[in-house]
C-alpha cells in the first residue's frame, strides 16, 4: 500500500521528502521553494499537512518564513478532517480557526470541500495565479470517507485492516465508484 503511513520518498513517485506528524515537511518545502526561486527554476512546491500536524509551532514559523519571503511558488495543502491519533483535534489542541490563522500569517487561503474534485481543481488553478505570497488550500474532509466503519473514527489513524475488513472496505469503495461511473 502506498499510503499506509506518511508517503515514503523511496516508494512514491513525486514525493521528495518523507515527513510525518511533526510539521517538518512545510519547513523543507519553504527551503525548496526559496531555492527554486534563487535558481530561477519555475517549479511549484506542494506540501501536505494534517490538521493535527498544524498544532506544531514549526508549522507557524514556516508560514511566517514563507510569507516574509513571498514564496508564491509554495502551495500548502491542509487536510482538515477534525481528527488525529489522539482523537478530536478540538479536544486535544484546537488549531481553529485555521483559515483565519493562515490569513493572519500572510498566506492566500482557499477553503474547499476536499471531496469535491471540481473545487479542488479550481483551488489548484487559483493557487498558480497568486503572486507575492504563498497559498494554502484548506480541505474539509471526512476521515475514512467511503468506508462505513472508518468514517470519522480516529481509531483508524495509522491502523491497517485485517483481511475481512479489507474486503468490506473495498466492496464499499467499489460500489461508490460504480455509482459515480453510472
Task: Show where each model-derived region lies.
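Cofactor-binding active-site loop characterized by glycine-rich and histidine/acidic residues
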Residues: 3-68
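Conserved thiamine diphosphate
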Residues: 40-43, 90-123, 174, 178-182
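Generic beta-sheet signal
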Residues: 43-47, 74, 133-141
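Acidic, glycine-rich active-site loops and adjacent beta-strand->loop/helix elements
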Residues: 49-56, 80-84, 115-117, 143
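A short alpha/beta connector and helix-capping loop motif
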Residues: 56-81, 136-139
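Short acidic, glycine/serine/threonine-rich loops at helix termini
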Residues: 58-60, 86-90, 147-152
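Histidine/lysine/aspartate-rich catalytic loop segments that bind and position anionic ligands
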Residues: 69-96, 100-102
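Glycine/aspartate-rich loop-and-adjacent alpha/beta segment that forms the canonical ThDP
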Residues: 117-182
Amino acid at each position: 500500500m502506498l499510503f499506509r503511513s506518511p508517503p515514503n520518498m523511496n516508494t512514491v513517485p513525486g514525493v521528495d521528502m518523507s515527513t510525518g506528524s511533526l510539521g517538518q515537511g512545510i519547513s523543507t518545502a519553504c527551503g525548496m521553494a526559496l531555492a527554486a526561486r534563487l535558481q530561477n527554476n519555475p517549479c511549484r512546491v506542494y506540501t501536505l499537512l494534517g490538521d493535527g500536524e498544524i498544532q506544531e509551532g514549526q508549522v507557524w514559523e514556516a508560514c511566517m518564513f514563507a510569507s516574509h519571503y513571498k514564496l508564491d511558488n509554495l502551495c500548502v495543502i491542509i487536510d482538515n478532517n477534525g481528527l488525529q491519533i489522539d482523537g478530536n483535534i478540538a479536544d486535544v489542541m484546537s488549531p481553529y480557526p485555521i483559515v483565519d490563522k493562515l490569513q493572519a500569517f500572510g498566506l492566500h487561503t482557499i477553503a474547499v470541500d476536499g471531496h469535491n474534485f471540481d473545487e479542488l481543481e479550481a483551488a489548484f488553478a487559483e493557487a498558480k495565479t497568486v503572486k507575492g505570497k504563498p497559498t494554502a488550500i484548506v480541505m474539509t474532509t471526512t476521515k475514512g470517507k467511503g468506508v462505513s466503519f472508518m468514517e470519522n473514527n480516529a481509531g483508524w489513524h495509522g491502523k491497517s485492516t485485517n483481511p475481512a475488513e479489507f474486503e468490506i472496505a473495498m466492496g464499499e469503495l467499489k460500489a461508490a465508484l460504480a455509482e459515480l461511473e453510472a
